[in-house]
Amino acid sequence: MGWSYIILFLVATATDVHSQVQLQQPGAELVKPGASVQLSCKASGHTFTNYWIHWVKQRPGQGLEWIGEINPNDGRSNYNEKFKNKATLTVDKSSSTAYMQLSSLTPEEFAVYYCARSDGYYDWFVYWGQGTLVTFSA
């Protein structure tokens, strides 16, 4: 009977740790066409440097587009070819925050931008930020 309780405790603890993972993003950014914007993604509930952070774009009525990923431990990054000259990914380890700078914004960049993280074992994204809507001011 003792082993059952130990296993139950370990499962409950692991589930609780998973439920604590958060990726916090601002709700919206208002920018002028041609300007640049820096989006943030503050991680908590896990060791920031252990997991790659991904960025994903979604335009209204369209599917998801993977922009790129960054390794918070050493700053290595990989980009979708389409976004290589548009997005720049960086991290600040001291604040457990990932950033994506978008330059020379056009109406094409009117979209919601999500940061995401895998569970560390598989490639799909288990944890998502709430997304930041980039809208344009006149």
From Swiss-Prot:
Residues 50-54 are annotated as: Complementarity-determining-1. GO terms for biological process: immunoglobulin mediated immune response. GO terms for molecular function: antigen binding. Residues 55-68 are annotated as: Framework-2. Residues 128-138 are annotated as: Framework-4. The keyword Signal applies. Residues 118-127 are annotated as: Complementarity-determining-3. The keyword Disulfide bond applies. Residues 1-20 form the signal peptide. Residues 86-117 are annotated as: Framework-3. This is Ig heavy chain V region TEPC 1017. GO terms for cellular component: extracellular region; immunoglobulin complex. Disulfide bonds join C41-C115. Coiled coil: none annotated. Pfam families: V-set. Residues 69-85 are annotated as: Complementarity-determining-2. Transmembrane segments: none annotated. Keywords: Adaptive immunity, Disulfide bond, Immunity, Immunoglobulin, Signal. Residues 21-49 are annotated as: Framework-1.
